[in-house]
Amino acid sequence: MDATACNESVDGSPVFYLLGIPSLPETFFLPVFFIFLLFYLLILMGNALILVAVVAEPSLHKPMYFFLINLSTLDILFTTTTVPKMLSLFLLGDRFLSFSSCLLQMYLFQSFTCSEAFILVVMAYDRYVAICHPLHYPVLMNPQTNATLAASAWLTALLLPIPAVVRTSQMAYNSIAYIYHCFCDHLAVVQASCSDTTPQTLMGFCIAMVVSFLPLLLVLLSYVHILASVLRISSLEGRAKAFSTCSSHLLVVGTYYSSIAIAYVAYRADLPLDFHIMGNVVYAILTPILNPLIYTLRNRDVKAAITKIMSQDPGCDRSI
């Protein structure tokens, strides 16, 4: 649509109106609210438990678990960016967002999405060094290197979405812009504009492709080398032990990219709009809720640390 057709607000700052899931009857809003609330609480508790376990247990003060802390922190921030507003929408009918709030939510959602992809690459590199270069592992993965890798992942992810957000903020909108989504997803905000959406849609697609496939390629490359090293181990017990150190990370990577695949398939043009929205909602919730379960059930060290914390008697006497 031509920008001249816009009925822009006098102060130039439009208000965004979230339409949520358009075909969902209001009678289902309360059940959906409780479902999302349950998921959100599980995400917060699961990831907080991982954080407490790693910090409190000295045996987990290793590079692998340092990066796990980053991943759990990301999962908490990632869902907190979107889910509270969704809860407010379904419980209170709170659909309005200011221009700046919407852009901030969009920026944070994109940044944390990128951060998760990059942290998974760093975790794959950690497993690569541990299995392919075990004798050099303490030197290569020292605390300074770990902090640099994590900081680089966060900083790159914080910078990458800025051009898309700035360009989106410069588009023309009606005084009340209707967003067909439960939160301010980039594509949904762009489509709410009355400017030409093609350049911004292409930019968003290109960023999504880079963030999705380049990290995946690096993860796969790491595991090709890991597999080659494991196959050179003569004993079956040694192979099984090497693979077991990677199993949790592999499951997390599989979950993350499965949720991305669901979101991409949902954006097919021939699917109803509700599929687009639900695909993104699944993407926003699936990985953060499964990551703690995977590391709790599959990783013996984390499982033992959590069991130790949960079994402690808060009323026991402590030495002064």
From Swiss-Prot:
Gene3D superfamilies per the UniProt record, alphabetical: Rhodopsin 7-helix transmembrane proteins
GO molecular function, one term: olfactory receptor activity
Glycan attachment positions: 7
SUPFAM superfamilies, alphabetized: Family A G protein-coupled receptor-like (SSF81321)
Annotated tissue distribution: Detected in the keratinocytes of the epidermis (at protein level). Detected in hair follicles in proximal outer root sheath and hair matrix keratinocytes (at protein level).
GO biological process entries: positive regulation of ERK1 and ERK2 cascade; signal transduction
A Gene Ontology term for the protein's cellular component: plasma membrane
Function: Olfactory receptor. Activated by the synthetic sandalwood odorant sandalore. Endogenous ligand is unknown. The activity of this receptor is probably mediated by G proteins which induce elevation of intracellular Ca(2+), a cAMP-dependent pathway and phosphorylation of MAPK1/ERK2, MAPK3/ERK1 and p38 MAPKs. Activation of OR2AT4 induces proliferation, migration, and re-epithelialization during wound-healing processes of keratinocytes.
Family: Belongs to the G-protein coupled receptor 1 family.
Protein name: Olfactory receptor 2AT4
Organism, as annotated: Homo sapiens (Human)
Designated gene of the protein: OR2AT4
